[in-house]
């Protein structure tokens, strides 16, 4: 009988396989640990457990307002539709084309009709896979929709060949702009459905959609800085003009309207980026496309399209007002020449990076100054009407299609009994609003504007003044035909202040005449003020577009220049220049001088090409990634670490920021706990066992709670922020905020990366959908209302991105240059209102630099402006910082940054270890922890916690699983190796005892 052959080959293979798997698991664990923060957030994995103390107190500090998720979701679905219905702006309604007749039969055209823009892309994107579509929204109102045409647009071939193209990833590079394309279907592709048009001919409803998103600005074609970015049928490369196929569509619909197939043509503008409006005006574009009605609807959110259906059917009357100036040619905006970033021509000489995650050698200049949007178009218009010297060749009527604040209605309204009274710190505006129509009920938005004097002092000291500035607004209730409502609007006197950056170096109130007016839009406001000054259309040879109403104007005179009343903030902090280093005409790094745009010389200062700057040695030095040199290391005593004082974070509930007990609590923190919390703040704040601090979860976003980056839960997607602002309804958006807070509370989130507070500097910013408006007053007022609502549920907001992150191209480190008046009056004003009026807890700083200094390392911005002037007590988080060295840990801590939005320890956590013995940096870490902990202890993260509860750190379940897998594989490897050893030994024994082979 032959002995059993040992299985050497089998055990060799199994030993090698298990050894390889063991090594792979170990390496995988090492990689996973690098991304532990991200995995914990995405997998909802806890790193601690709570040890409950003995208490009977109610620890539900922030309570839900809904009895069930179903109740909350149903309410929010209606709320989102209401926001859209109140925010959409009716632009044109000839021949009473809208509302549609009962049971009207309509055909929907344009790829956008079946593929709406619900929101943008990037970190603010939301899941709208189950959102209703336009067809469903219309059918819910009894409108019948052409099924044949709908099915054609929805067919696989049409969706494959003619879908909107958006940049696929967040790249931040100029080249990303080339990826945008409208890609509308040509008219010939609709031929198979043409026989169905007549039956559904009550209206042809055309949807023009444009996408935007994080990491890529929209292409504008030739703009003085670059050539066409889109070729072929897309036309000039301007993404916001109609494409050749869209124009072809309109031409063919006009022909069908002319032959009686369609009764009317209605256009819906589904975009947060302002399209060029020339196609709505035959005198401008040179062709009549027969468009009867047009409505701007922005990005509609999850259920907002239902609100559009209500508007089209007449269930609701439009009452929204534009929050951007809509132009015939977007390149008429002076900001366009400096919108896309430029490279310093000598960047290579100083080894300045011009692309990637650490940009140094790219810059942008806000040369237009305060003249953003209507502040330019209406101010230059007034100067032309008044015959002011150097106003130049400017024609408002051929430049502006629809002014800021414009919004039509199905009914008409009249204003009367206008009156203004003055008190110590405010003006109270009252007037009567009457629905003068005979058929439709509706709401009216009342806007109050002021004009401040443009004085010789201003001209001598480089102060700029707009012809009109929004300073108050209100929305009536629904008024039936013939009904009236008395409206009261309070205007703070501080709205009249202006910043004098060159002489007084603080806010001043100029001497002279101030005008207040109630108006329907910014242009109407200027015409009213011109009327009060005695100007008429006839008297200006037609330079004035229409006569204003002087009865809606009130004049107030300030007898003497006042440089003291507004020279201190509400908390008593002296206000003076903080941002000279961002002004190329003042900065010690000055890369060249800039001529700011000025109404004193429009012809000589309106840009005709990008501002030219050149890098120099001092600028290059200040663009280095780390500025701190360690000389302050021993300037302070090393803080106490790891003390056993017995306090927990919950014991600080209700304590003031300056309560001395905070020092006792902070003494308990360990160095590792501080580093972990500060450097790994990606969508969370970490647990800290020494003080019983729970971990918190933070999430995007601007349109409501989302989880675009972590794949977690998402909730109601509201409309884009511009639609929210266009409601001009503070109470409504406060309710939106409360519901966003409810979503966070229900899903376990304590922080929200939003609202977005950057400005619509041009129509081409990729993230305009995340930001409210071109005007800081309406943006700040609406934002403050939303913030109040969100935070009422214990959710701390991070206003993003403070500040000047108004474009996407080269955003990671771009050098942004502007003067202080512009910074304060335009780009910081939203944060000011959101913090002082809305009580916003936190901010997220921008990727960009102020001059040479990264936002997160700008002490004057974070500590000087936000904390000292405005009194903000919460934390400052960076934008995503996992791969950027310029978002430096130590420089940021010194300047007031508290937490880095980073999921990996590669850069910042590793760097922090080098400063364990640097008392100055450890002190900055302690200060940062104070801001973080003060925020968290006042949030819903403390729900369920009492002062007697403690916390114990544990391994997250996924880490335990990996360790278990490694252990199992290691044991299997050992067993297989043992079996292999036995097999080899047996093989040798068999070889030794085998009979000798005959060698004959």
Feature names for model-found ranges:
Residues 493-566:
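Terminal connector regions
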């Amino acid at each position: 009988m032959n002995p059993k052959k040992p299985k050497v080959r089998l055990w060799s293979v199994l030993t090698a396989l298990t050894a390889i798997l063991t090594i792979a698991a170990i390496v995988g664990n090492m990689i996973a640990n690098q991304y532990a923060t991200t995995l914990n957030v995405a997998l909802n994995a806890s790193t601690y457990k709570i040890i409950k103390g003995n208490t009977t107190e109610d620890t539900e500090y922030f309570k839900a307002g809904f009895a069930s998720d179903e109740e909350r979701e149903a309410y929010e679905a209606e709320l989102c539709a209401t926001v859209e219905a109140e925010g959409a702006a009716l632009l044109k309604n000839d021949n009473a084309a809208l509302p549609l007749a009962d049971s009207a039969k309509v055909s929907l055209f344009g790829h956008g009709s079946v593929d709406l823009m619900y929101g943008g892309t990037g970190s603010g994107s939301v899941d709208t896979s189950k959102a209703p579509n336009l067809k469903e929204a219309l059918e819910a109102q009894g409108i019948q929709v052409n099924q044949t045409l709908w099915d054609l647009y929805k067919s696989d071939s049409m969706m494959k060949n003619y879908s909107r193209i958006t940049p696929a990833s967040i790249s931040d590079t100029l080249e990303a702009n080339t990826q945008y394309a409208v890609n509308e279907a040509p008219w010939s592709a609709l031929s198979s459905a043409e026989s169905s048009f007549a039956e559904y001919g009550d209206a042809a409803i055309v949807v023009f959609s444009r996408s935007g998103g994080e990491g890529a600005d929209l292409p504008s074609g030739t703009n003085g800085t670059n050539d066409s970015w889109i070729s072929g049928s897309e036309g000039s490369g301007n993404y916001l003009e109609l494409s050749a196929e869209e124009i072809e569509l309109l031409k063919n619909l006009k022909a069908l309207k002319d032959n009686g197939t369609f009764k009317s043509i209605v256009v819906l503008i589904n975009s947060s980026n302002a399209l060029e409006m020339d196609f709505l005006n035959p005198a401008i574009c040179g062709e009549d496309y027969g468009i009867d009605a047009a409505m701007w609807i922005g990005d509609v959110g999850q259920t907002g399209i239902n609100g559009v259906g209500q508007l089209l059917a007449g269930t609701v009357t439009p009452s929204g007002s534009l929050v951007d100036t809509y132009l015939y040619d977007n390149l008429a905006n002076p900001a366009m020449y400096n919108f896309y970033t430029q490279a310093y021509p000598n960047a290579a000489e100083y080894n300045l990076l011009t692309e990637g995650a650490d940009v140094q050698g790219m810059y942008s200049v806000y040369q237009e100054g305060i003249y953003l949007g209507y502040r330019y178009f209406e101010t230059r218009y007034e100067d032309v009407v008044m015959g002011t010297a150097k106003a130049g060749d400017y024609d408002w009527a051929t430049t502006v299609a629809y002014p800021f604040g414009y919004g039509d209605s199905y009914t008409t309204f009249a204003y009367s009994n206008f009156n203004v009274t003055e008190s110590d710190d405010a003006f109270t505006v009252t007037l009567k609003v009457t629905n003068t129509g005979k058929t439709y009920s509706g709401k009216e938005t009342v806007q109050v504007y002021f004009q401040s004097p443009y004085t010789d002092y201003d001209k001598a000291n480089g102060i700029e003044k707009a012809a009109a500035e929004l300073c108050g607004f209100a929305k009536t209730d629904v008024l039936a035909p013939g009904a009236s409502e008395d409206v009261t609007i309070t205007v703070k006197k501080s709205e009249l202040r202006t910043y004098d950056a060159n002489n007084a170096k603080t806010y001043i109130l100029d001497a002279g005449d101030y005008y207040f007016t109630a108006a329907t839009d910014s242009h109407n406001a200027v015409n009213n003020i011109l009327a009060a000054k005695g100007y008429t259309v006839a008297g200006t040879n037609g330079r004035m577009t229409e006569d204003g109403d002087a009865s809606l104007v009130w004049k107030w005179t300030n007898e003497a220049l006042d440089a003291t009343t507004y020279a201190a903030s509400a908390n008593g902090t002296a206000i003076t220049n903080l941002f000279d280093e961002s002004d190329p005409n003042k900065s010690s790094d000055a890369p060249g001088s800039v001529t700011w745009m000025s109404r004193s010389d429009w012809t000589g200062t309106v840009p005709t090409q990008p501002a030219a700057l050149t890098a120099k040695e001092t600028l290059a030095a200040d663009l280095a990634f780390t500025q701190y040199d360690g000389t302050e290391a021993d300037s302070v005593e090393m803080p106490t670490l790891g003390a056993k004082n017995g306090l927990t974070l919950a014991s600080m509930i209700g304590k003031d920021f300056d309560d001395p007990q905070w020092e006792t609590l902070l003494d308990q923190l360990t160095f590792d706990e501080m580093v972990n919390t500060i450097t790994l703040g990606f969508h969370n704040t970490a647990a800290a066992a020494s003080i019983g601090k729970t971990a918190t979860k933070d999430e995007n976003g601007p349109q409501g709670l989302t989880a675009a980056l972590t794949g977690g839960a998402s909730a109601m997607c509201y409309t884009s922020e511009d639609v929210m602002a266009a409601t001009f309804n503070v109470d409504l958006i406060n309710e939106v905020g409360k519901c966003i807070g409810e979503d966070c509370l229900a899903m376990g989130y304590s922080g929200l990366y939003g609202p977005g507070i950057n400005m619509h500097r041009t129509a081409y910013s990729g993230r305009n959908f995340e930001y409210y408006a071109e005007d800081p007053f309406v943006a700040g007022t609406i934002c403050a209302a939303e913030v109040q609502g969100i935070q009422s549920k214990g959710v701390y907001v991070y206003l993003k991105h403070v500040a000047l992150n108004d474009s996407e191209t080269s955003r990671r480190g771009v050098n942004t240059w502007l003067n202080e008046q512009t910074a304060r009056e335009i780009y910081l004003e939203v944060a000011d209102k959101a913090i002082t009026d809305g009580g916003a807890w936190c901010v997220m700083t921008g990727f960009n630099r102020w001059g040479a200094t990264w936002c997160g390392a700008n002490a004057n911005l974070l500590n000087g402006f936000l904390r000292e002037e405005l009194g903000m007590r919460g934390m400052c988080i960076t934008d995503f910082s996992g791969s950027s060295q310029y978002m430096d840990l130590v420089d940021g801590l010194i300047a007031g940054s508290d937490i880095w939005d980073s999921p990996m320890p590669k850069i910042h956590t590793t760097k922090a270890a080098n400063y364990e013995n640097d008392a100055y940096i450890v002190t900055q870490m302690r200060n940062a922890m104070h801001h973080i902990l003060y925020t968290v202890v006042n949030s819903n993260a403390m729900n369920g916690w009492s002062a007697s509860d403690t916390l114990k750190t544990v391994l997250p379940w996924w880490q335990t699983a990996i360790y278990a897998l490694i252990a199992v594989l290691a044991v299997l490897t050992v067993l297989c190796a043992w079996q292999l050893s036995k097999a080899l030994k047996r093989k040798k024994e068999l070889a030794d005892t085998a009979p000798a082979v005959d060698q004959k």
